[in-house]
Amino acid sequence: MDSKESLTSPSEEIPSSVHGQERGNVMDFYKTRRGGATVKVFMPSPSLGGSSQSDSKQQRLLVDFPKGSVSNVQQPDLSKAVSLSMGLYMGETETKVMGNDLGFPQQGQITLSSGETNLQLLEESIANLNRSTSVPEHPKISASVAVSAALLKKELPETPSDVSSEQQNLKGQTGTNGGNVKLCTADQSTFDILQDLEFSSASPGRETNESPWRSDLLLDENCLLSPLAVEDDPFLSEGNLKEDCKPLILPDTKPKIKDNGDLILSSPKNVPLPQVKTEKEDFIELCTPGVIKQEKLGPVYCQANFSGANIIGNKMSAISVHGVSTSGGQMYHYDMNTATLSQQQDQKPIFNVIPPIPVSSENWNRCQGSGDENLTSLGTLNFSGRSVFSNGYSSPGMRPDVSSPPSNSLSAVGPPPKFCLVCSDEASGCHYGVLTCGSCKVFFKRAVEGQHNYLCAGRNDCIIDKIRRKNCPACRYRKCLQAGMNLEARKTKKKIKGIQQTTTGISQETPENSANKTIVPATLPQLTPTPVSLLEVIEPEVLYAGYDSSLPDTTWRIMSALNMLGGRQVIAAVKWAKAIPGFRNLHLDDQMTLLQYSWMFLMAFALGWRSYKQASANLLCFAPDLIINEQRMSLPFMYDQCKHMLFVSSELQRLQVSYEEYLCMKTLLLLSSVPKEGLKSQELFDEIRMTYIKELGKAIVKREGNSSQNWQRFYQLTKLLDSMHDVVENLLNYCFQTFLDKTMRIEFPEMLAEIITNQIPKYSSGNIKKLLFHQK
């Protein structure tokens, strides 16, 4: 039996009809106020008047059974017929109770075996129809209702005029419903077809031992079918017979929880109709009326909520899911995440998940409490004797000692391994200021002290790892410098270690001496940093030129690469100058003027230092990936300029300048040129310059230790600072020439071009004052 059936409340006179592609007979069972049953038979009759053809495609025949006319009906057959009509007979696997109107299948064929059983009441009751009404017979009655139509054709006359006159007379009568003909008067008693049905005596809102079918209908009109009564039936909607059941918006059916944990049974007016869907695959079969809903909280819980008498003492009715029958109070919670639903939209869900219904604040505060702590979801609702699992699935059949393993179990592990910053091998310690392995430590020491001239055969981008670290020494050495390896870091470490040992030795004392006297250390370690120590911290790192050594070397390529590298070095020099103690106290215009006058001093002196430390003053190490050797120096316009720059590195090599001396001399070169009219913060400038002159003297004393040679070395170092003016003057002249000569097509970065543009007029006018230590 493939049909769609729905039950309506007695308080509403909404007929169920089938609006499909094919019209057939439709039967509606109305619950009257007298407890009887009313049968409506819809038959197509287009032979009526043309004025009523549009809205009278289906005429309704209202049949009211008197109590005496059906006294000989057998009760067992009546019970079976009613149970079949209600759609709750579970023997038929194809029966569907959906949210659409009540109707028979489109085939509409009622076999003789089932028709005689279901329409046995009609055979005896329709015999009295010829006495009270007359309905025209349509000549083209559908074959889909052959049995029922044949029974009606024997009793109904074929006079269309009688129907028209009867309808006109009944339009103004009070006992009619639209165009329906009411055969029985109001004072006639009707046959109660529900009196012998075995329904549960318990009903929501009533006592347990009182049957709802014996209630006074005049006092409580909704008590007859209270478990199925709703104020607004959402299932009585028009739709095609072939349409699937869509999720419906139902009233809020969330279980109400008392303070003691018991469920509050909902009132009959608030319990919705069941939505039972039995597929061919038998995914789910609900043996008791229930609804499927979605909670308001984050996770979506699908659960069958049972009404009224089905929940007594926390005992749940049985549900069969995938062939697994549950009984004895078992309850299954299906915890589905909303994200999972969105990801699996192409799959057919077992449950029709219904969107959450907004609940008014008054009902929520009255039933659930006023605070967020009273929120209760089905996934966390525990009944006595039930074990709840972490995934929301609860069943008493599982052992209580079974527990899920911890999700994030951290095993006791040691410290993470340390890797070399150069070749990614396992590091053996901190060497030359960088965490490296022993192999890279030895390589860097030999590369610096051996004064090797490494050249990359590729593009200075070779991969340096544990296996290929010996393939390209140039790229390996470049990566060592990039990581920050420095030979001076080893000396600094030894000094710090010596200071710590000295402090520890002074602070140690015997117990007997400590009891008698308090020892004050003779020399305390200096807590405030010195200017030289700050200069070591702010020293800029080595930059790369990005020069492609695989292409042929030309003057244009090398000069353009040097200019691009110089632009980045100027930016680094600006940041370095602002970090010098006292420099930012100068006027902003003075800061800009000093940087514009000294940018070439800073780059040339730093180039000489790198060449002195890495190439023994034989090569010019502009960058780890751009080293000017003798072959590149022989290019046009290159030798004269390289000769001036090699002079600086050779002097540093000859004097064996220390790193602290280099830092002080570099700072003094920043303060070596001023305008002729002076600076706006001239006094502060002189004070800062004198401070670093004294720091240079301290560095000399620290290096020599013998006061007899300190003045001689100070003279040599300051003489080198004076000679830097001649070197920078020659370099600036060539730089200005290449900048102004557009035929050479030498590229200049934007910032460097702006500095040169502002500096050319000042040098041309001679508005520069050189601050020299010695007279020429």
From Swiss-Prot:
Protein family membership: Belongs to the nuclear hormone receptor family. NR3 subfamily.
The superkingdom of the source organism is Eukaryota
Q: Which GO terms describe its cellular component?
A: centrosome; chromosome; cytoplasm; mitochondrion; nuclear speck; nucleus; spindle
Provide the positions where the record notes the PTM Omega-N-methylarginine. R23
- Ranges for region Modulating: 1-419
Chain residues forming the annotated DNA-binding region:
417-492
Renumbered to this chain, region (Hinge) spans 486-522
Q: Where is this region: Interaction with CLOCK?
A: 484-776
Q: How this protein is processed and modified after translation, per its record? A: Acetylation by CLOCK reduces its binding to glucocorticoid response elements and its transcriptional activity.
Q: Which residues carry this modification: Phosphothreonine?
A: T8
The taxonomy runs: Eukaryota, Metazoa, Chordata, Craniata, Vertebrata
Q: List the disulfide bonds.
A: none
The modified positions for Phosphoserine read S45, S113, S134, S203, S211, S226, S267, S307, S404
Name the chain's protein: Glucocorticoid receptor
Write out the ranges of the annotated region (Interaction with CRY1).
Answer: 531-696
Gene name of this polypeptide: NR3C1
Point out the cross-link Glycyl lysine isopeptide (Lys-Gly) (interchain with G-Cter in SUMO2) in this chain: K258, K277, K293
